[in-house]
Amino acid sequence: MKEKKRKKKRVIPGFGLSFGITIAMLGFIVVIPLCTLVIFSAKLSFTEFITTVTRPRVLSSYRVSLQTALIAALIDAVMGTILAWVLVRYNFPGKQIMNGIIELPFALPTAVAGIALTHLTTTNGWLGAFFGKFGIRIAYTRLGIIFALIFVGIPFVVRAVQPVLEKVDIQYEEAANMLGATNRQTVFRVILPEILPALIGGFTMSFARGLGEYGSVVFIAGNTPYETEIAPLMIMSKLQEYDYASATSIALVMLFIAFIILFINAVLQSRTCLLYTSDAADDLIGVD
């Protein structure tokens, strides 16, 4: 007689209970608040909704948020990758301290970060005074917004790329150099394919964080309409005016943009993984 297979005792409850808890948490934390947002927006007719979200000042705030968040995320992608590389490949005094400081923007209240960055970049601050000699203003300009978004976004890239770099065997780089590859070829043909999915993920999270950032930006931006006024500030202004329908309408557009960004991120990451997996397989076949 065949022995009946015994079911493995699982530490975590079975699929039914686990799935039910997951759906309940997802519903209370994510779905219900989003549905509330849609319900408040529904108080406006379709024409009123379109009029609200396409006013020149609102469109300008979208443009400022998108442009500054994109530029900051691109800079984060470059600087974050370099920082991750230094932390993984080199040993130096204070390495652990630097590794901990990178996570400071995660723990620091955004309002505190905004006040600190503003004092640093005004004409009386260290950075502001230095760049002021060259006629460059940071505080109360879009450059200040980008500076703040770089500060809050760079940990996303570093923490996404760092663990992947730790898994990349340095022998691959040594083998590439022995085969005559230049440093540039080693970076783009050996290292970049390994870290690209993580880099895309870190860039996207930095971009998404920048779009919704309020606390660290509101102090340094100056909040000049059509110049440095961001979309989250427009939402807050509408709430202070008790215009909840307009506030939720503007927020709904931002939510839609965030969903698009995350969807594109998922598609790019999956295609990138498939692309470089197939390339690696072709290389192995060629070697054989």
Predicted regions: what they are:
Residues 1-11:
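Short, Lys/Arg-rich, polar N-terminal cytosolic tail immediately upstream
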Residues 10-45, 54-166, 190-215, 236-240, ...:
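Membrane-water interface segments at the C-terminal ends of transmembrane alpha-helices
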Residues 162-174, 182-183:
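Membrane-helix/interface signature in polytopic inner-membrane proteins
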Residues 179-180, 193:
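Glycine/proline-centered hinge or cleavage motifs at structural transition points of membrane proteins
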Residues 220-225:
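Juxtamembrane non-transmembrane "cap" segments at the membrane-aqueous interface
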Residues 276-281:
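Conserved small/polar residues in nucleotide/adenosyl-binding loops
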